[in-house]
Each structure stands twice: as structure tokens, then as C-alpha cells.
């Protein structure tokens, strides 16, 4: 049983850039987990080769021009760990991947990672829920918010604000930015580094862009139907205000500025128009590393909380299911357990 406060994909999954990658630098265990995550998407893409919501057309990234430009160091690091990477001069990019304005790329060049891709999470979630239902699973979305039901020190299910109880042998907290507070209420500390994020999806347009772009001022990717999805940390920091009632106010000037940044890196600098805007918490644990596994302070309860939720989503569910079904800890999750915050 999945208990959700409203329709599926109404949280962080519905406003994610969902770039599938292990680009740049991170811990070795996190890199391995992300690569396993990308592998599962490749398997899915082979099973569904004609869909327009899961693509592996590569990723292109560059740094701002200046003394802090580290693109050469990043390239050397990626090569050293066997991560497929090509360092390109600005004028060489068009021959490798289309749709980018070479004039926007710093003179130090850009890295093209051909193995990267993107997924439209709401569509993926719909596909997975169809499989879930076919196997006898139930999605509950009309009972309000839920919390972990704890009796005699053990998680025995969930209870919603409507008073509905769902008893279970195991409970998984996979509620995005709400995980730390819900875990704390149940008795487990999980440090939280969640910022507010902003994602814009444009109206469809004809454009040759195929790769995911991660640039100094904007990240963007194609989306189904010819739209472009884009975000930037600075835009969320400057343009999103949390109201007293928990809703979000978005500054139109910042939206316009972000659209202009996106247009400036796209070939032909097309006019981009807003189709939808999403704002809300971007799930990031306090130390930046995923939190996946049993909450030892609350037997019977597990957590899945991570920044790279799209990239590792399929494999995280697989490995967590293994732990729940077998009672054995999976070695790939050894450094990601919730207990690490209680041990500090």
C-alpha cells in the first residue's frame, strides 16, 4: 500500500529536472550507487525503446570563465574513474550534440558525457503505478497526510489525518523533503539540508536541443512534447518566498531572468514561454549523501531520502526492498544508513 497526501507525483518528483548522471565529483560509494541507478534506467529504456519520456542523449556542462573554472580538473577526474567524458572546445560542441549556442560556452571548453540522460518522473511514476496495481498494490491518495504509527517502540503502519489506519509489517518513509520531520516525530534523527527549488517548464517549441545542459546560470533539458524544463539555484534563492501558510510566492522578474538565461545557451536564442512553474523543497540530506535503510531507532521503519532521487530512484527501491524482504543489509547501502546522524 502506498499512502500519499494527494495525487501521485504532487511533490518533489513533479518539479525535478531529473537528470540521470554521476557527473563531477562525489564519494565513491555515492558514485557507485548513481551508476547502478543509471544502469536500471538503461534496462528500462531497452524495454521501452520508443518512449519520449526517457532519453540517453548525453549531458553537456561547463563552468564560468575565470580563475575558478575547474572544467579541466573535472574532466581529468571523470576520466580517472572511467566516467565517459569528452572535453570539447566551444566550436567543437555542435558536431557532437546539437542545439547549443557556442558563444555561451567559456573558452576553457565544456565536458560532454554521452552516457547521461533524463527522465520525466510523473510519467515514469504513472507507469510504475500501473505495474504496482497489476501486482495487487493500492495507492491511497484521498486520506490526507500520514504519519508513522508506532506502538511499543515499533512501527506497525501509518495513520492519516482522516484517522484511517494502515497496518503493515514494514513502513518506508519516502516523502521527499518531509522525511526528516516525519522521522523525528517517529523517533529517528535525520539531518536536513533541504532548500527551496524552482522548476519551470516551457511551452513546446521546435528546437534541436537533445542533451541535458548544466551551465553556470541555468540547467535545462528537453521534455516530452517539445517543452524545455529548466532550473537554477540562484533563481530559487532570489525569486521564491515562503508565505506564512506554507505556499510559495514566485517573483515574475526572476522567472523572466531565468527564461532569458536558458534562451542564451540555446542555439538561435529562442523565445521561451512559461507553461508551468513548480516550487517547493528539494530533498537534500544534511551531509549531502543519500539516506536509505532501516531506522534503527524505530524498528520496522525505513527511510529513502536523497537529492539524486531521480538517478537512484529505481535502484534505491530495489535495494531497500531486498533489505526489507530478506532482513539482510545490502553492502551498497552501508554508508547511507539513517543511523549515521545519531552516531555523531
List where the protein language model places each region.
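Central helical "cap/lid" subdomain
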Residues: 162-210
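Flavin (FAD/FMN) cofactor-binding and adjacent substrate-gating region
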Residues: 39, 63-135, 140-141, 147-154, ...
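Dinucleotide-binding Rossmann-like beta1-alpha1 core, especially the glycine-rich loop
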Residues: 18-96, 217-219, 246, 253
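Conserved beta-strand-loop-beta-strand element in the redox core of flavoprotein oxidoreductases
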Residues: 146-166, 171
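Mid-domain beta-loop-alpha active-site segment that forms a flexible
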Residues: 110-130, 176-178, 250-261, 305-306, ...
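C-terminal catalytic lobe of FAD-dependent flavoproteins
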Residues: 121, 263-344
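Glycine-rich FAD pyrophosphate-binding loop
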Residues: 1-14
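Active-site lid/adjacent beta-loop-alpha segment flanking the redox-cofactor pocket in flavoenzymes
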Residues: 206-298
Amino acid at each position: 500500500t502506498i499512502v500519499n497526501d494527494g495525487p501521485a507525483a504532487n511533490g518533489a518528483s513533479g518539479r525535478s529536472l531529473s537528470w540521470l548522471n554521476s557527473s563531477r565529483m562525489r564519494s565513491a560509494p555515492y558514485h557507485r550507487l548513481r551508476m547502478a541507478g543509471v544502469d536500471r534506467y538503461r534496462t528500462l529504456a531497452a524495454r521501452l525503446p520508443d518512449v519520449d519520456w526517457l532519453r540517453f542523449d548525453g549531458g553537456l556542462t561547463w563552468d564560468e570563465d575565470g580563475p575558478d573554472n575547474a572544467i579541466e580538473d573535472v574532466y581529468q577526474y571523470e576520466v580517472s574513474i572511467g566516467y565517459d567524458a569528452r572535453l570539447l572546445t566551444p566550436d567543437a560542441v555542435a558536431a557532437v550534440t546539437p542545439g547549443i549556442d557556442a558563444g555561451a560556452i567559456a573558452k576553457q571548453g565544456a565536458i560532454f558525457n554521452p552516457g547521461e540522460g533524463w527522465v520525466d518522473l510523473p510519467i515514469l511514476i504513472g507507469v510504475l503505478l500501473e505495474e504496482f496495481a497489476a501486482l495487487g498494490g493500492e495507492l491511497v491518495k484521498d486520506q490526507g497526510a500520514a504519519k508513522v504509527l508506532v506502538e511499543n517502540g515499533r512501527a506497525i503502519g501509518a495513520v492519516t489525518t482522516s484517522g484511517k489506519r494502515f497496518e503493515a509489517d514494514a513502513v518506508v518513509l519516502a516523502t521527499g523533503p518531509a522525511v526528516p520531520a516525519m522521522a523525528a516525530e517517529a523517533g529517528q534523527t535525520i539531518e536536513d539540508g533541504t532548500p527551496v527549488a524552482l522548476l519551470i517548464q516551457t511551452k513546446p517549441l521546435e528546437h534541436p536541443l537533445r542533451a541535458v545542459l548544466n551551465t553556470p546560470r541555468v540547467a535545462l533539458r528537453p521534455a516530452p512534447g517539445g517543452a524545455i524544463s529548466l532550473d537554477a539555484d540562484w533563481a530559487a534563492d532570489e525569486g521564491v518566498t515562503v508565505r506564512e501558510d506554507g505556499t510559495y510566492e514566485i517573483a515574475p522578474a526572476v522567472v523572466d531572468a531565468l527564461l532569458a538565461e536558458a534562451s542564451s545557451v540555446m542555439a538561435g536564442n529562442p523565445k521561451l514561454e512559461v507553461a508551468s512553474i513548480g516550487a517547493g523543497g528539494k530533498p537534500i540530506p544534511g551531509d549531502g549523501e543519500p539516506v536509505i535503510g532501516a531506522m534503527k531507532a524505530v524498528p520496522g521503519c525505513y527511510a529513502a531520502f536523497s537529492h539524486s532521487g531521480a538517478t537512484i530512484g529505481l535502484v534505491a527501491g530495489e535495494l531497500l526492498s531486498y533489505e526489507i524482504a530478506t532482513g539482510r543489509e545490502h553492502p551498497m547501502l552501508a554508508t547511507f544508513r539513517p543511523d549515521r546522524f545519531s552516531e555523531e
